[in-house]
């Protein structure tokens, strides 16, 4: 028994010390009877805190990009980034884009450069500064061999760190100073919920231009109202009323817009969501037919789940009798192993297979234990374990044809 405990502890220490990094994604594309391969890889120099991301396309017309990212001594903050493109004629890497970032207390400054004749030329500069109660963001452009102010956004925060006032400025070249162009003022209720936003524009004087109101009506419905200031008064342009039907587990939102001829708000859209145990089961969208004075269904979506609350089917049907359906399969661990795409035949009313994706996982490794420094995996698959392979098929009416295959390679240290 003691030996088993010692072995378990020893194995646990090794497992904790082991680091798993995603190193590359190799994709094979099958088209016109030929295979084309692409490789997206990343390598990190721990000593120099430098990350290199390489993308290579092999085939009749080779193509490639390279990105080199330099971090600070702790390996956390990005200091610089350089991008290069592969020149098939010369076999060299040509400069494409560069950014240099510096940090000063609460300030972050990023200078960007574009390549002209393989030489770096200033492009844009971004300067952001945060304090306890404000945020400032300034944009510069590069002209006449120097950085020139272009625009500025200043945000004043309230005690809850929410927007209180937002001001936007443009740089006046002649006066060499910032010119305030517009501003927005936010108002909250005692519970800290947004109640009103008023936008102001500058003419001879500052005048209110647009107002967004959020409130609860006497029936308990949530209301969003959009108003414009015209001819000395506020005119409601559109309004959305959201009702929660707790008895039938429904959320109903009705949108109305101003009829410029009658000067009255008229129905335009109705959106109904139905829930079961807090899980969305159905969405139906209706539009208002002005001539028939009635709602017509534009779109309906139905969703189904398994006992683990995984979405296993999403079906959408449109007003032209077309439809699309996704079916998801999961393994016992909760990994999505297959996605099937089907289209609805408006004539036969039958679903026909069209595309399919299959995933393969390493069930011994958890997904959240994998380090992907450059985020080269953008698949966003629903999974618990580490992804090893992805296959993409299309259906030709008789059989499934493999069109793409991706392999995910890792480095275990």
How does the language model describe each region?
Residues 1-21:
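Bacterial Sec-dependent N-terminal signal peptides
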Residues 18-413:
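Buried hydrophobic residues that stabilize the cores of well-folded domains
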């Amino acid at each position: 028994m003691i030996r088993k405990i010692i072995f378990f502890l020893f194995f646990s220490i090794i497992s904790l010390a082991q680091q798993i990094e995603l190193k590359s994604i190799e994709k094979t594309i099958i088209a016109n009877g030929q295979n084309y391969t692409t490789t997206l890889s990343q390598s990190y120099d721990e000593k120099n805190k430098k990350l290199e991301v390489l993308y290579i396309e092999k085939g009749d017309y080779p193509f490639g990009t390279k990105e080199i990212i330099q971090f600070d001594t702790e390996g956390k903050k990005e200091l610089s980034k350089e991008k290069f493109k592969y020149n098939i004629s010369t076999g060299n890497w040509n400069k494409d884009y560069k950014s240099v970032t510096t940090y000063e207390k609460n300030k972050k400054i990023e200078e960007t450069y574009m390549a002209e004749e393989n030489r770096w030329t200033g492009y844009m500069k971004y300067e952001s500064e945060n304090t306890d109660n404000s945020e400032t963001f300034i944009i510069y452009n590069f002209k006449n061999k120097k950085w020139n102010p272009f625009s500025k956004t200043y945000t004043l925060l309230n005690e809850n760190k929410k927007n209180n006032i937002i001001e936007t400025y443009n740089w006046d070249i002649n006066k060499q100073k910032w010119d305030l162009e517009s501003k927005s003022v936010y108002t909250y209720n005692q519970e800290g919920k947004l109640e009103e936003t008023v936008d102001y524009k500058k003419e001879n004087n500052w005048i209110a231009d647009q107002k967004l109101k959020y409130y609860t009506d006497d029936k308990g419905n949530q209301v969003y109202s959009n108003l414009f200031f015209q001819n000395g008064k506020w005119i409601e342009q559109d309004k959305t009323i959201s009702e929660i039907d707790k008895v039938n587990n429904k959320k109903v939102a009705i949108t109305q817009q101003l009829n410029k001829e009658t000067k009255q708000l008229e129905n335009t859209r109705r959106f109904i969501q139905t829930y079961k145990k807090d899980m969305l089961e159905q969405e139906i969208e209706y539009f208002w037919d002005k001539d028939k004075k009635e709602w017509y269904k534009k779109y309906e979506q139905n969703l189904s789940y398994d006992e683990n609350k995984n979405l296993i089917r999403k079906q959408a049907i449109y007003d032209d009798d077309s439809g699309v359906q996704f079916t998801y399969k999961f393994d016992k661990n909760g990994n999505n192993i297959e996605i099937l795409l089907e289209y609805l035949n408006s004539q036969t009313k039958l679903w026909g297979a069209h595309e399919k994706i299959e995933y393969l996982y390493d069930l011994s490794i958890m997904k959240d234990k994998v380090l992907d420094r450059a985020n080269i995996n953008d698949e966003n698959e629903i999974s618990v374990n580490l992804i090893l392979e992805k296959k993409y098929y299309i259906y030709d009416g008789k059989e499934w044809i493999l069109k793409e295959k991706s392999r995910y390679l890792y480095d275990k240290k």
